[in-house]
Amino acid sequence: MRIVMKTELSLYVDGNKIICEQHGDIKNAKKIVLFCHGFPGSSRLVRLCDNLKNSSISLVEINYRGDKKSEGKFSFLGSIKDIKTVANYLKVKYKVPLHALGYSMGGLYVSNIINKEPHIFKKVILLNPVVDSMALFSNKPLMDELWKHAKNILSLKTPEM
């Protein structure tokens, strides 16, 4: 039985130390997957490391500014910059194909990045990505719409009534 190695990688972005967790033998990897999780706290929702035990793929999980051991304050634009910085570092240092796995909000970050820099990743996987960012970031709270529907359901009224 092969044990998946786990080490930490740290980089500085805008003076803040960003901590990434490396899973697998990154020095001998034939591919690297950069795992971009969603909001801070959602990084443990997807467990991929055990699936890498017998592969030549290394997984690097980024912890954005303000998440876990990473310094700084969390922000959406900061998270995008963190991903781009880590991606460029991995491409230059290891010179193997770099893929992205964007989960939830991380999927929105990765989508934003590849829209402007389509060649930064060889392949991209979006797992349950946030796709309606206009509704998410609009001035009108999403909760108003949800409460409207909830009241109709709770009062057993159809929307036409």
Tell where the protein language model's regions lie, with residue ranges.
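N-terminal cap/lid segment of alpha/beta-hydrolase-fold proteins
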Residues: 1-25
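The alpha/beta-hydrolase serine catalytic core
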Residues: 18, 120-161
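Short beta-strand element of the alpha/beta-hydrolase
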Residues: 30-38
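The serine-hydrolase catalytic nucleophile loop
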Residues: 38-51
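Catalytic nucleophile-loop/oxyanion-hole region of alpha/beta-hydrolase
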Residues: 40, 67-94
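Conserved alpha/beta-hydrolase
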Residues: 53-69
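Short beta-strand immediately N-terminal to the catalytic nucleophile in serine-hydrolase-like folds
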Residues: 100-102, 127
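Gly/Ala-rich beta-loop-alpha elbow adjacent to hydrolase catalytic centers
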Residues: 102-110
